[in-house]
UniProtKB/Swiss-Prot annotation:
Phylogenetic placement of the source organism: Eukaryota, Fungi, Dikarya, Ascomycota, Taphrinomycotina
Protein keywords: DNA-binding, Metal-binding, Nucleus, Transcription, Transcription regulation, Zinc
Name of the protein this chain belongs to: Uncharacterized transcriptional regulatory protein C530.05
Positions with biased composition (Basic and acidic residues): 12-21
GO process terms (BP): DNA-templated transcription; positive regulation of transcription by RNA polymerase II
SUPFAM superfamilies (UniProt xref): Zn2/Cys6 DNA-binding domain
GO molecular function per UniProt: DNA-binding transcription factor activity, RNA polymerase II-specific; RNA polymerase II cis-regulatory region sequence-specific DNA binding; sequence-specific DNA binding; zinc ion binding
DNA-binding region extent: 30-57
Keyword Transcription: yes
Subcellular location: Nucleus
PANTHER family: TRANSCRIPTION FACTOR, TRANSCRIPTION FACTOR PDR1
Annotated organism of origin: Schizosaccharomyces pombe (strain 972 / ATCC 24843)
Keyword match Transcription regulation: yes
Length: 762
């Protein structure tokens, strides 16, 4: 036997070389003893058992196992298993199988007349899906350098997992890899070395240029200073000195942050951006000492620091620093009514305004990162002073101008308050435990609140009338529009991902009332806002950039769910326009968006492939409908068996380089560019559906789900919902988002000083 050999003398050598009289032994049993499972004495040349039975004694050499890598792999599996068990333990005990239809007894006040039903696919039925589990739990991302970040269910990461679920099977794993990024570990570029160099303060002439740029760009968004007040504090050469001759660190730090923001506002080269960062680093070493002085001036400095982190696209730093600002504000009692203290009216209003700016930033940063808000509404009774849009710019309103009598600060506070309530009721830990009926009730409630807020705005301030916005305040109103659209998406996002059918009839006739259609329409609006916005200062563009990317994912999901809808071509053009706008911003904004571009190109390519496959299926389906067969008795054609491999048409692909792309019709037949034909095809499908329901011998495999009338809103045809069950897509989710080392959802996160990316919209 070739695999058998006798033991070598080296293996049989005794432990002590001087004792040569002992018999040679093998430290393991021979093959026969191992086979019979009896004790072997290991003697050589033959053991006692083999000698007594008269058979040859043979030992087979067995290779030693290398257990190092195997143990590491097992340890990794155990860790991942523990994480999954922890996720399941936290979700399954709260599983509630209540009915998914809102009954009159459970309908909130003023909603008895609302038609609110749910589709065939229950959100609770999907609780075992990875996307829904991660949406409930949030995601803990581990980066390649070992740092960890938590992203809640309102962040971009949550919605992109649903996008990956819908896209699974449409395109190749290689194309979809840019969405999951599971193989590469994350979705941001490697960190560059930190440059700790500082810059000296500029001359008075250059400083005045920076100050002027600050008041034209950043101060109108959060007017913590007036020009007169600022020059009164920082206009003299000795503004940094105390009476005893020591340095006033608070004044110095606040002045430097203003210069840094002004330098950033006029930066048109990378050198100027680096100079702004170097100026700002002068404050990092003294920030702790400054914060020890609990005063209103300290609060102003920390708030300006948060604004700077916004300007350099560091949302996680914004969220952390806002937490410090909130604690300082609460220490100073700014969350309580300032009018009740023994201070002057102007001082009380100044403190109240700064408090509400902090409140605004707290809600916006939490919405983008998916983390909890710091301020709780139950603890706040601060007044909202009157502050018109003209006050933001230090202008006197023209006589008779309605904008001069409208409290714009109060409108911003009300909007961000609704954002906080939505985050708490729909995306917090307790909110994610709600069943489908409760979620639909909350959607109706918050949509009514947001719609009432919208109707309270002056006509020229309403987001749909953005072309009527006065030029002097366009930045403020565009930013407010972006927050409004994003809040609308947050309210109705569950309807899209969980297939909830909610009819918001309180919006009235002539308006979109379907919840899914409202979510998609809001996404289209915010992407159009991003594409059409030009000459805006970087802070606003970077905030809108995040919301535009999130909205692109919503539009991507819409295309995958209804690839035969007549508006899909426009939606695809919308995705391409966002990509081209980001290319322009990347060129002139000194930011790196390579991975964002890859993700967008992956979505565009996948959407094109889905539309092409759906059209090909519709062609085969319409050919079968054109025959004279009795569809009532013959059943539906087995479209799932149509071989797409035999198709000569190859779906268009997006090149790896970030070049301008336009949508071209690649339909096998131009007939699909005609929305009338799609409606005709849709009617044929619905008629077949009715015939199949009336047939006694209909195969269950070909039954259609019921079609709700409200699915026809916003050019969304139900043809896809009837076709997708036969779509030759894979049933399982190929993209793995469950691993800890996955994609950083804030795709533009930590871009500024750490040279990473920025983060998390009718």
């Amino acid at each position: 036997m070739e695999n058998l050999k006798s033991a070598s003398p080296e293996e049989d050598s005794p432990r002590h070389g001087d004792n040569m009289g002992k018999p040679k032994r093998i430290p393991r049993a021979c093959d026969m003893c191992r086979k019979r499972k009896i004790r072997c004495d290991g003697k050589q040349p033959a053991c006692s058992n083999c000698v007594s039975h008269g058979i040859p004694c043979v030992f087979t050499a067995r290779p030693k196992r290398r257990t190092g890598q195997r143990q590491m792999y097992i340890k990794s599996l155990v860790s991942r298993l523990e994480q999954m068990e922890s996720t399941l333990r936290s979700v399954i005990p709260n599983y509630d199988q209540q009915p998914d239809i809102i009954h009159p007894s459970s309908t909130p006040k003023n909603y008895h007349d609302l038609n609110c039903t749910k589709g065939e696919t229950s959100s609770d039925d999907s609780t075992d899906d990875i996307a829904f589990l991660n949406e409930k739990m949030g995601t803990l991302v581990t980066t390649p350098i070992g740092s960890q970040k938590y992203f809640g269910s309102s962040s971009t990461f949550s919605i992109i997992q649903h996008a990956a679920k819908f896209a699974s099977g449409v395109e190749s794993d290689k194309v979809l890899e840019h969405l999951s990024m599971a193989k590469s570990g994350c979705l941001f570029d490697p960190d560059e070395s930190f440059d700790g160099s500082k810059a000296e303060l500029p001359s008075s002439e250059i400083a005045n240029i920076y100050i002027d740029a600050y008041f034209k760009s950043y101060n109108p968004l959060f007017p913590v200073f007036t020009r007169e007040n600022f020059y009164q504090k920082f206009g003299s050469p000795n503004c940094f000195k105390k009476p005893d001759g020591s340095i006033d660190l608070v004044n110095y730090a606040s002045y430097v942050v203003v210069l840094s923001l002004g330098c950033l506002a006029i930066a048109d080269t990378e050198e100027q951006v680096s100079r702004a960062n170097a100026l700002f680093k002068n404050t990092l070493g003294i920030s702790i000492e400054v914060t020890k002085d609990m005063s209103f001036r300290t609060l102003v400095f920390n708030f300006l620091t948060s604004v700077y982190y916004c300007a350099v696209s560091k949302p996680n730093a914004v969220w952390l620093n806002v937490g410090v600002v909130v604690r300082v504000a609460q220490t100073l009692g700014l969350h309580r009514n300032s009018a009740m203290w023994s201070i002057g009216k102007e001082d009380a209003e100044e403190k109240a305004r700064l408090f509400w700016y902090i409140y605004y930033l707290d809600r916006v940063s939490s919405m983008m990162t998916g983390k909890p808000v710091a301020f709780q509404d139950d603890d706040i009774d601060q007044m909202v002073p009157f502050y018109s849009i003209y006050c933001y710019y230090g202008l006197k309103p023209p006589e008779g101008d309605p904008l001069g009598t409208f409290n714009f600060l109060e409108a911003e506070v009300q909007l961000t308050r609704i954002v906080g309530q939505v985050l708490k009721e729909l995306y917090s830990v307790s909110g994610m435990k709600s069943n489908s009926s409760q979620v639909m009730e909350k959607i109706l409630e918050f949509d009514l609140l947001l719609n009432n807020w919208y109707n309270s705005l002056p006509d020229c301030m309403q987001p749909r009338n953005r072309f009527k916005i006065p030029k002097f305040c366009s930045s403020n109103l565009i930013l407010t529009s972006a927050i409004y659209y994003s809040c609308l998406i947050l309210i109705h996002r569950h309807s899209l991902t969980k297939n909830l059918q909610v009819n918001c009839v309180h919006r009235g006739t002539g308006s979109i009332t379907d919840s899914q259609a409202l979510c998609i329409a809001a996404a289209r609006s915010i992407t159009n806002l991003f594409v059409e916005s030009v000459d805006l200062q970087p802070l606003i563009m970077k905030i809108i950039m995040y919301h535009a990317f999130t909205s692109s994912i919503i539009i991507f999901i819409s295309i995958l769910k209804r690839p035969l809808a007549s508006i899909c071509s426009e939606d695809l053009n919308c995705l391409i326009s966002v990509k081209n706008r980001l290319i322009s911003f990347e060129t002139h904004g000194f930011v790196r968006l390579n991975v964002v571009m890859d993700a967008l190109e992956s979505m565009i390519s996948t959407a094109q492939a889905a539309m092409q496959k759906a059209k090909q299926i519709a062609i085969n389906f319409s050919s079968n409908l054109a025959t004279n067969e009795d569809v009532t008795n013959s059943g539906m054609p087995d479209i799932a068996d149509v071989s797409l491999k035999s198709q000569s048409h190859v779906p268009p692909r997006i090149s790896s380089n970030h070049s301008d792309t336009s949508v071209k019709s690649n339909s096998p037949s131009s007939i699909f560019d005609n929305s009338g034909y799609l409606n005709s095809l849709n009617n044929s499908i619905l008629q077949m559906h009715q015939n199949l329901q009336n047939s006694s011998n209909t195969n269950d495999q070909y039954k259609f789900d019921s079609v709700q009338e409200n699915e026809l809103h916003a050019n969304i045809t139900p043809v896809l919902d009837q076709t997708m069950s036969m779509f030759p897509f894979k049933d399982q989710l190929d993209l793995n988002f469950a691993a800890a080392n996955v994609y950083n959802p804030n795709v533009f996160d930590d871009m500024g000083l750490d040279c990473s990316f920025y983060g998390n919209g009718l």
